[in-house]
Structures are given as C-alpha cells and as structure tokens.
Amino acid sequence: MFLKSLVLHNFRCFSDLTVNFNNRLTVIVGGNGAGKSTVLDAATIAAGTLTSAMDGLTNYGIKKGDAHYKCFDLGSNVDVQPQFPVEITAIGDVDGKEITWTRNLNSAKGRGGLASAKPLTLVAESYQERMRSGDRELTLPIISYYGTGRLWAQHKEKKGDTFEKNNRSNGYIDSLDGAANDKLMMKWFQKMTLQEFQRKQEIPEFTAVRTALEKVFASITGFSDVKVQYNPDTGDLDVIYYDKDKKHIRIPVSLLSDGYRCTISLIADIAYRMALLNPQLLDNVLTETEGIVLIDEVDLHLHPTWQKRILKDLMEIFPKVQFIVSTHAPEVINSVKRESVVVLKDCGVWEDADETK
C-alpha cells in the first residue's frame, strides 16, 4: 500500500492543494507555516482510513478545527468564517490496484465518517475477514505516524496499553497518535523475551526486530558488537556494545541522548508493529511488510552526521515501506534525489528545483 497523491480542499491553511508522492520516499520542505505538518496530518487521515474502518480501532477523521478560515472585510469589522466542506481525497495503490477515496466534513456539526471512503473501507473489511479465518497469505500494511512531540509524549499512559488478545490488528493500536507507544512496545519485548526463554529457542520475528535496532545503533555510533536486550529488572531495553576504546558498555535506552533515543524508539516502534501485524513472515517481517510511515521533522534531535543517513537507514531496514517525511535540515534534503522532494511555498507546491538548495 502506498499513497500516490492527495487533494486537499478547505483543510487548515490550504483552500486547495494537490500533492503528489513518490512511492518510496517523499521529503516535504518549506518555511515555518508553509503547511508541512498539515500535509502530513492529511496523509495520516487518508492512510488511517484503513485502520479507522477496523473493529476496536480509533477513527482518525477530519475535525471541525481542521476547517480552513476566510476573512471578510465588513468595514468596521473583519468577519472570520470556517469553510465547508473540508475534504481530503486520496489516490493510492492497495494490493496492486489503484483506488480513490475521500474523507470529508460537511459542516461544523457534522461527523467525519467513513461513508465517502468506501473503496478503502471495503479493503479493511476484507482484511478483517481474512484475519478471522487465519489467512497466512494476508500481509497487513503498516500505517504509522510520528509527530514532533514523539520523544516526550512516548511515556504517557494511553488507552491502548494492553494486549487484550493475540490479535494481529494490535499492531495498529495508537499507531497514528504521533508518538512511539513505549508502554505497549515494552510489553511486547517482555512477552517475546519470556517466550524465547520458555521455548529455549529464538523467535524469528523477534530476532529480526533486535537485529534492526543493533544495526542502526552501530551505524549511527560506529560502535562494534552491538546487542539489544530487554531487561526484566528495569522494564527497559539495554544496549550492549564496545565503544571506540574497546570498553564494554551496557546502558538503558532511556538514558541515551535524545538523538539516540529518538532514533531507536522510532525504528523499534515501526519494527515491533510489523512483527505484530505479520508474524507469519518470521525473519523476513521487516523486509516483506509494506505500508506507509509518516514522520514530522525526521531530523528531530539528530546530529548533522546522522541527518545525512537517517533516510538511507530507514529505507534499507524497511525496503517495502513508503516514507513521507518533513524536514528543515539541509543535510536531510541534500541526501535525497530531487524527485523525492516536495517544496511548499505561498500556499502551494513550488516547482523550482533550486528552492531546495
């Protein structure tokens, strides 16, 4: 599953906007207030239609506060009025077929339902039926969004913090809330660690997740012999490695710097959700799971050296995922091809390639 384009009408700062996406990577750039987060939020609502249509999951729709406002000069006063309908129309590829669906809100008292998104909600219903029948051929797409508050919001209590049952759709719990859900993720790590101990053998999808974390930590630090383990005494992940002085280090992820912690939490959240959604893929779960991951300010807390490689690392670890990200960082922009960059300016998409220099 991936998004091809969005058409926004009366959505926040845009009266009308069309954005096209690369099927592997789109980097959205622009000055403050240009609408980068708005485009990501619209894409989240569009992609999240799939999970919104599933039983027991939150409906992420358009809210009345998302309406675009117009000002009317009435002489002695300026009248500010919300504009309706608010519409997000998406074109995407789902299971190899192009479909179009719309999310809308027709009035301030209206409800952002799913009636106009039937082409995608039918897919969600089909997925649910196939899950109920235990269909091993079903590969569920990851759909996840990470906002600018992801580092500090991740420890908050959330309503979806328990696995009621071993249900594949648990991989979608809180996935569009904008922050890595550490409580839910740690419960999964705890559960997998216990299962490996009881079985006295590795669980392939769990090994794949740990290996991804070890690979990215080694990549951004240059440290060797990196291992990631769940620590049952602290309820945290420990990173074990040899530093550049060959000193053996063991440190909880929670005590790492913001940049390390943000990167590891992001990749861990994506990876463990894939393992929940598609456990039948075993050690291929990270390389075979498709889907859409949206990241606001992908450079958040990262050293410029890491900014140059964060997108490369993400696409190598998750080769079938479409990443739609925003950034201010020149290092991130210069690390990608021009066709992957969308520049927002003057309430629209700016076509001048030199604008990204």
Spans of model-derived segments:
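Extended helical coiled-coil dimerization/tether regions that scaffold
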Residues: 158, 170-288
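Switch/communication elements of ASCE P-loop NTPase nucleotide-binding domains
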Residues: 1-57, 235-357
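Residues in well-ordered beta-strands of folded domains
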Residues: 91, 147, 229, 240, ...
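P-loop NTPase switch/coupling surface
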Residues: 1-184, 201-204, 215-218, 319, ...
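Extended hydrophobic secondary-structure segments that form protein cores and membrane-embedded regions
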Residues: 143-147, 229, 291-297
